[in-house]
């Protein structure tokens, strides 16, 4: 297990050096209006006033601070990249926003955080970095108070079975083992070095069953959209901020979202 964490941490440390200054993350716009959350996840958020929130796999903290902008009383960001958390702390300080940062792997329960949060949040490109979803869910729910909620919005598993041109099935839908690749550039920084990364595909059942099979967890909502809030491919846009794959419009889901409650 340590090997995959070391390989992927090296990748994300490198990306965290580049992403805060990328056009994709647009630091100038964020300083003017610290809000990067999209309609999919915002539709699931409760009233945040008075809430203590943990953002899992927060990268360098833009979404974390966006939760603060929406009125959260206290925000915490958790990530395994020390470079990312250094950037997150600098971003918060530059905006004079209060936030807390935790250096940890998302699947390893941090005892000091257990039972502390009203809401645990995770968004876009999170679960595929883990070989097994159950430990991730166990950690997320451990951090919630009774009655607290988990909200996840992520790219749909169907998207990950297709080749780079979205023309052919190139990868398994089910988790048949690690997918080892080398990639040059990142989704935000094309100049990123060529580096190895390890990922896993997970069917929807792997994501939902750790919730519905547990007697202290209640799946409140599950939804899918045939559009993405991110333009990460050659796209068409039937509405502002809703991107579909050009030539594949409406054929399959691009994003799923869920809300679950700790009983």
Predicted regions and their residues:
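A short acidic, Gly/Pro-enriched loop at the edge of an enzyme's catalytic core
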Residues: 111-120
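Conserved class I S-adenosyl-L-methionine
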Residues: 149-185
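Acceptor-substrate binding/catalytic loop of class I
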Residues: 154-165, 190-206
């Amino acid at each position: 297990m340590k090997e995959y964490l070391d390989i992927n941490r090296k990748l994300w440390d490198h990306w965290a050096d580049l992403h805060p200054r990328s056009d994709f993350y647009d630091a100038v716009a964020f300083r003017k209006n610290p809000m990067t959350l999209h309609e999919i996840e915002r539709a699931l958020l409760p009233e945040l006033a008075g809430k203590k929130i943990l953002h899992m796999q927060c990268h360098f903290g833009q979404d974390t601070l966006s939760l603060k902008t929406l009125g959260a009383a206290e925000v915490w960001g958790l990530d395994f990249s020390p470079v990312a958390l250094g950037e997150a702390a600098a971003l918060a300080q530059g905006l004079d926003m209060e936030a807390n940062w935790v250096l940890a792997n998302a699947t390893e329960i941090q005892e000091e955080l257990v039972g502390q949060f009203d809401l645990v949040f995770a968004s876009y490109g999170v679960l595929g970095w883990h070989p097994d979803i159950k430990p991730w869910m166990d950690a997320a729910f451990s951090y919630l108070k009774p009655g607290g909620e988990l909200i996840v919005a992520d790219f749909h598993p169907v998207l990950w079975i297709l080749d780079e041109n979205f023309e052919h099935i190139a990868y398994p839908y089910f988790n048949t083992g690690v997918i080892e690749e080398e990639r040059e550039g990142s989704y935000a920084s094309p100049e990123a070095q060529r580096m190895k990364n390890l990922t896993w595909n997970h069917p929807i059942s792997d994501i939902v069953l750790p919730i519905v099979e547990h007697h202290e967890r209640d799946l409140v909502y599950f939804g899918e959209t045939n559009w993405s809030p991110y333009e990460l491919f050659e796209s068409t846009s039937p509405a502002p901020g809703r991107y579909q794959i050009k030539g594949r419009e409406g054929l399959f889901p691009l994003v799923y979202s869920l809300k679950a409650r700790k009983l």
